[in-house]
């Protein structure tokens, strides 16, 4: 049934020959139409998908045909057009359809021309179709390859030709896929899209394919845009992918089945087709879910005839599902990666799979040119999603697969391929068998999934099971594949260098933006490998390519920002993580990964694998972190519910996972990039776990994850891109923050994973864990963005109060904007890694840079914790490792991250023991900030640290070593307070900060002790030093105050507005948090009364920090806490803090200090509430709003009565507003005129009573 196995040739052939080819089909009808009709008959629900396949198959650039036709679809040549490929037809119509197909297939002699007309550059590597159609038990009918090949030529030549792509939208999709995948390069390796073999999958494949830079705009406009946007900003894929995300209706069991198509469905016509198919596939999804259930282990079968099971039982009607587009996928993969597409794809759809599938369609596509004849895995035409997302990560797979697959390429003998194809045909678990025979191809599905090349590994091993593949039960196959994958991953792990390097290079290239062209060529090579891999895992490959494309887009944008440093660090992290926790490492999404990881290490593992692959390219670093850890389930689910934050793996159901994947698609590219080298090993286990736990082949899950990612690609992709951008550059402050938010949402699971995984991983490699955690934390931090922060903060504020750990995890409301706003003020070092930026947000208060760094660490922790309270707690409680995890969460806050890791892990540790010393060190904290050496930091962390390193290292050695630790504790507390104040000002942020701070300090002791105080001292000192380096010039108070004022104020103000809504809830939580903080600080600070108290007192300054940030402009750190002058003085902070302590009356007077802090926080909230109406009415400008807030808070805090009377506050604010309005009218600056008015207002200070009297001390 060479059916379209030359799917490329088929494209045209499909469309044109179909006219001829489908004599049975009623040539009168356009091949697509006829096939559609036939498919409708055969597969009611699959029909739509089939139709797209039809269109794709016949016109669809060889893409779909590659996917569909190559696979059993090609058998239904006539149907192929219809998209109800032979496989599907065989499945559904079995004999009758088979006969029809055979008759049609026979005519298709023209369909598969012996030689393809390939566009220059499209080596014949497309496919040499050796197809054999076996209907039922009948003898295989060799289809004339020539007929298919001509079509391929047409497709190839007209690859961009709309005729086929226009012939039918699916055709376009396929074309797109082909173009996108093949040319688009790695991303489209929608070979996984092959999964798209079913129409829906095809689109999915198509979706991923567009991401590749295949320029062939001709196919559809969609592809072109994808190429254009995708190429430049692989986010396009995401953009496309997100629409499909909603389509993630694929069953939980079939993560890849529906999602791939849905995620990829939207991206391009193919994606649209996928969507159509998805509609069909809804039935298919159900059937697929049954299939996945039935063929849980027969992922390969699912891939080949994912729908097949559905077809047989649920989808018998939809032959396309059975077709699974394995052939179609190959075409897509091939056409997509025509240059480097797998040359050989043998898809056998036959009774083996199911009795119902009497027809056995064996299509072997042997590509002549392009070196690697990557056998595209037979992808389920209808249920390509399972196959697609299965394990193949479109982006990763192509890259990782390249090297492996090149070697594997040769492996695809027509016979074996055919066997595999035949295995695929059976809807039953046996269907998967063909993949093993396909060996690399089919395993490639699994290997493809390897974000880091893990999938590649799968390629090699699966060949062993080929014979049994079809017979493997869903579970057996899964296990077998998993085992093989593990071995492969291990092998890869042992020698991940070449593929990962290549992948990395490609990813980096892509990230660099140079990717599109280089990626195309590289991808071609890789595509070949990928395709070989994808032969077995075409839909996975397609998905991966999609994910990869997205990742590339994200990676490219992010990587461009981050540069190779980030990629490398990520890769390292990934490698570490994969090495440390290979199973989780492959987690589809970092967020999903993390969260899922916890709950479903297996399930999560697979998904995480996918995610991590998807993200690996996107955020390999983050993903790296996420994969190893097993995220707690509670957090995951909450995250998922939130939507912003992906749920924990353990809590996630397949649907949840799908949703998460959609959301998490963002992070996936990251993982792929750095993880490429070591991910393979890690992925294998993860995949394995997913495979086993979910009963879906790991590939399926991966595909699903990919698809989810793709679906959430648009949103996630942008998020991912943003995340990457953030990670990469502080420059992309907003973007980074958005990304961070997105990432955080995506990453929280990762963070969780690092929390769980980091701890486990910490033992293996504390640094690695830190690094991973750092990434996770950073993600969490991202997640802790204002939106997420408020959400998380409000809900988790209470938990934070409940326990320091809770506190840590309770409020993740640290506004990412802090970093953004502060980024200008942050030292280049801090910002340099773009993680530094995160540091700033982490330690929103520049007031105490060190505190900030610590705060960053803490907040990273806290944020992380807040984002996933339980996870953070677990992490923190876990000890230094968890702290490190928290720290890593702040990876983006390079410094904060360092501090988070060293200071958070160690700083936290130090907090308990060195809190006392901290006070002493407080004055020199800013200098210690330099301490860039994070002893325990992993290369990533160190990289971040190095970026954060400042010349103040000298301070770090002296005080940083000894005092930094103390400071970390004291500073943390101070920061807690400061952050509380500031965040209180920011409302939810304040609560979060306080919660985080409180939890961090409290956790610090436990985590700190766990991690080891001595180590903590060193690391924290260094990190603390580093952190202070940010605002080294400013003393703690000043840095916090000044930074807050300069960069923090803006961020705070902006956040204040954003968080104002969360103000009330925040307030309640803040109060609780304050109480908790008081308790924590009382407990903690009493032990280090003198040492810590000064820090708290400075925190007093910290108190002012919130206001101070606003007052800072007035250069009066609202040191209303006892040090007004210090704000300007950079060194005053020590004395300032001391003063603050004094004013707080007692370094041991933590309660008083806390009281002041809380008062300030409450004042901030009250003032905000009072100002809000004016601001909303635009009676005052933002600047005025900030000034009034600062002044009013200062006044209120310094009022004699010290009480916060809402009425008085309102009056004070009104007076300020009036004054400012008056001055504005008269062209005077409130600063000048307020001078006189201020005195009047000063009386107000006693009780902030009087109409707002702006205190002169601003």
Curated annotation (Swiss-Prot):
For bias type Acidic residues, the affected ranges are 269-283, 384-395, 971-986
Question: Where is there biased composition of kind Basic residues?
Answer: 480-491, 540-555, 562-579, 594-613, 845-877
Q: Cellular location of this protein?
A: Nucleus
Q: This protein's superkingdom?
A: Eukaryota
One Pfam family matching this protein: SCAF11-like_C
Comp. bias intervals (Pro residues): 208-223, 374-383, 924-937, 1246-1258
Its function, per the record, reads: May function in pre-mRNA splicing.
Full protein name: Splicing factor, arginine/serine-rich 19
């Amino acid at each position: 049934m060479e059916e379209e196995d030359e799917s490329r040739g088929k494209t045209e052939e499909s469309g044109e020959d179909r006219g001829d080819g489908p004599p049975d089909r009623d040539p009168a009808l356009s091949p697509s139409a006829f096939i559609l009709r036939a498919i409708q008959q055969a597969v009611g629900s699959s029909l739509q998908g089939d139709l797209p396949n039809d269109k794709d198959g016949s016109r669809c650039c060889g893409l779909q045909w590659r996917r569909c036709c190559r696979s059993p679809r090609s058998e239904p040549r006539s149907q192929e057009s219809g998209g109800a490929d032979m496989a599907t037809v065989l499945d559904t119509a079995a004999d009758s359809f088979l006969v029809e197909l055979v008759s049609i297939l026979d005519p298709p002699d023209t369909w598969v021309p012996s030689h393809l007309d390939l566009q220059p550059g499209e080596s014949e590597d497309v496919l040499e179709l050796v197809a054999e159609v076996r209907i039922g038990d009948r003898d295989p009918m060799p289809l004339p390859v020539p007929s298919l090949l001509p079509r391929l030529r047409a497709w190839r030549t007209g690859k961009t030709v709309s005729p086929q792509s226009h012939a039918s939208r699916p055709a376009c999709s396929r074309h797109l896929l082909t173009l996108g995948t093949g040319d688009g390069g790695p991303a489209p390796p929608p070979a996984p899209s092959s999964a798209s073999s079913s129409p829906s999958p095809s689109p999915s494949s198509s979706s991923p394919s567009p991401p590749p830079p295949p320029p062939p705009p001709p196919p559809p406009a969609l592809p072109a845009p994808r190429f254009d946007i995708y190429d430049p900003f692989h986010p396009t894929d995401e953009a496309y992918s997100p629409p499909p995300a909603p389509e993630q209706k694929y069953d939980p069991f079939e993560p890849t089945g529906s999602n791939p198509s849905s995620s990829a469905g939207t991206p391009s016509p193919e994606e649209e087709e996928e969507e159509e198919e998805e509609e069909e596939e809804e039935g298919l999804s159900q059937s697929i879910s049954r299939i996945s259930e039935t063929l849980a282990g027969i992922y390969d079968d699912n891939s080949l005839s994912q729908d097949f099971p559905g077809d047989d039982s649920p989808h018998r009607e939809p032959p396309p599902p059975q077709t699974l587009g394995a052939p179609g996928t190959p075409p897509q993969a091939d056409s997509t990666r025509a240059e480097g597409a797998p040359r050989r794809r043998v898809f056998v759809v036959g009774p083996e799979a199911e009795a119902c599938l009497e027809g056995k369609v064996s299509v072997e596509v042997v590509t002549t040119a392009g070196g690697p004849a990557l056998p595209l895995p037979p992808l389920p035409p209808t249920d390509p999603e399972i196959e697609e997302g299965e394990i193949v990560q479109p982006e990763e797979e192509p890259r990782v697969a390249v090297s492996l697959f090149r070697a594997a390429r040769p492996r695809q003998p027509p016979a074996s391929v055919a066997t595999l194809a035949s295995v695929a045909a059976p809807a039953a678990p046996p269907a998967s068998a063909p993949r093993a025979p396909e060996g690399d191809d089919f395993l490639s599905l699994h290997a493809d999934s390897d974000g880091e090349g893990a999938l590649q590994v799968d390629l090699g091993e699966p060949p062993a099971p080929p014979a049994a593949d079809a017979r493997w039960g869903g579970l057996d196959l899964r296990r077998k594949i998993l085992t093989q994958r593990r071995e492969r991953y291990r092998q890869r792990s042992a020698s991940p260098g070449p593929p990962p390097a290549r992948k990395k290079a490609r990813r980096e290239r892509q990230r660099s933006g140079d990717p599109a062209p280089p990626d195309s060529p590289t991808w071609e090579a890789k595509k070949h490998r990928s395709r070989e891999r994808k032969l077995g895992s075409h839909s996975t490959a397609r998905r991966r390519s999609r994910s990869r494309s997205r990742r590339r887009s994200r990676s490219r944008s992010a990587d461009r920002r981050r540069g190779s440093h980030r990629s490398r660090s990520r890769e390292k992290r990934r490698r570490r993580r994969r090495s440390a926790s290979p199973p989780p490492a492959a987690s589809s999404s970092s967020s999903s990964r993390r969260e899922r990881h916890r709950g479903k290490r297996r399930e999560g593992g697979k998904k995480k694998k996918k995610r991590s692959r998807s993200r690996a390219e996107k955020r390999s670093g983050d993903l790296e972190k996420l994969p190893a850890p097993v995220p707690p389930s509670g957090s995951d689910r909450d995250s998922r519910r939130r939507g912003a934050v992906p749920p924990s793996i353990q809590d996630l159901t397949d649907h949840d996972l799908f949703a998460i994947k959609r959301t998490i698609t963002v992070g996936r590219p990251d993982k792929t990039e750095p993880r490429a080298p070591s991910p393979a090993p890690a992925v294998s286990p993860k995949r394995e776990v997913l495979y086993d736990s979910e009963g879906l082949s790991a590939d399926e899950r991966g595909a699903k994850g990919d698809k989810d990612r793709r679906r959430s690609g648009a949103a996630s992709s942008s998020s991912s891109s943003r995340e990457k951008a953030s990670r990469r550059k502080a420059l992309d402050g907003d973007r980074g923050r958005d990304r961070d938010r997105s990432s955080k949402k995506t990453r929280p699971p990762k963070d969780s994973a690092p929390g769980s995984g980091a701890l486990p991983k910490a033992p293996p490699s504390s640094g690695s864990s830190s690094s991973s955690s750092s990434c996770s934390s950073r993600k969490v931090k991202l997640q802790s963005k204002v939106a997420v922060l408020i959400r998380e903060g409000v809900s988790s504020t209470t938990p934070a109060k409940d326990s320091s750990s809770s506190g840590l995890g309770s409020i993740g409301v640290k506004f990412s904007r802090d970093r953004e706003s502060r980024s200008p003020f942050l030292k280049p070092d801090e910002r340099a890694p773009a993680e530094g930026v995160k540091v700033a947000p982490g330690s929103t208060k520049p007031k105490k840079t060190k505190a900030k760094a610590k705060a960053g660490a803490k907040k990273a922790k806290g944020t992380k914790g807040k984002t996933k309270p339980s996870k953070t707690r677990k992490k923190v409680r876990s000890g230094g490792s968890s702290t490190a995890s928290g720290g890593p969460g702040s990876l983006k806050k390079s410094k904060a991250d360092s501090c988070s890791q060293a200071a958070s892990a160690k700083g936290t540790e130090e907090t308990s023991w060195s809190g006392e010393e901290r006070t002493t060190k407080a004055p020199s904290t800013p200098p210690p900030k330099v301490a860039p050496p994070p002893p325990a930091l992993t290369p990533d962390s160190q990289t971040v640290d190095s970026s954060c390193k400042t010349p103040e290292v000298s301070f770090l050695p002296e005080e940083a070593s000894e005092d930094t630790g103390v400071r970390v504790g004291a500073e943390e507390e101070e920061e807690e307070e400061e952050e509380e104040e500031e965040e209180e000002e920011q409302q939810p942020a304040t609560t979060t900060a306080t919660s985080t701070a409180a939890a961090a300090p409290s956790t610090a002791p436990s985590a700190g002790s766990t991690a080891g105080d001595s180590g903590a001292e060193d690391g924290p000192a260094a990190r603390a030093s580093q952190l202070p380096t940010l605002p080294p010039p400013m003393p703690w108070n000043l840095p916090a105050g000044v930074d807050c004022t300069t960069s923090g104020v803006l961020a705070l103000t902006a956040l204040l507005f954003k968080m104002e809504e969360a103000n009330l809830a925040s307030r309640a939580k803040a109060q609780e948090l304050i109480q908790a903080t008081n308790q924590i600080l009382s407990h903690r600070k009493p032990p280090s009364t003198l040492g810590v108290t000064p820090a708290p007192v400075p925190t007093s300054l910290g108190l002012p920090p919130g206001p101070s940030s606003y007052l800072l402009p007035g250069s009066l750190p609202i040191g209303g806490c006892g040090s007004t002058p210090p704000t300007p003085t950079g060194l005053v902070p020590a004395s300032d803090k001391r003063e603050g302590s004094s004013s707080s009356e007692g370094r041991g007077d933590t309660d008083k200090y806390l009281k002041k802090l809380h008062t300030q926080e409450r004042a901030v909230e009250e003032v905000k509430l009072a100002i809000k109406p004016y601001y909303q009415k635009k009676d005052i400008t933002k600047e005025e709003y900030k000034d009034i807030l600062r002044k009013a808070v200062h006044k209120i805090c310094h009022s004699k009565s010290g009480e916060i009377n809402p009425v008085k506050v309102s009056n004070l604010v009104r007076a300020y507003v009036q004054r400012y309005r008056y001055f504005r009218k008269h062209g005077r600056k409130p600063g000048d005129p307020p001078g006189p008015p201020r005195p009047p207002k000063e009386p107000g200070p006693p009780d902030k009573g009087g109409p707002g009297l702006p205190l002169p001390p601003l």
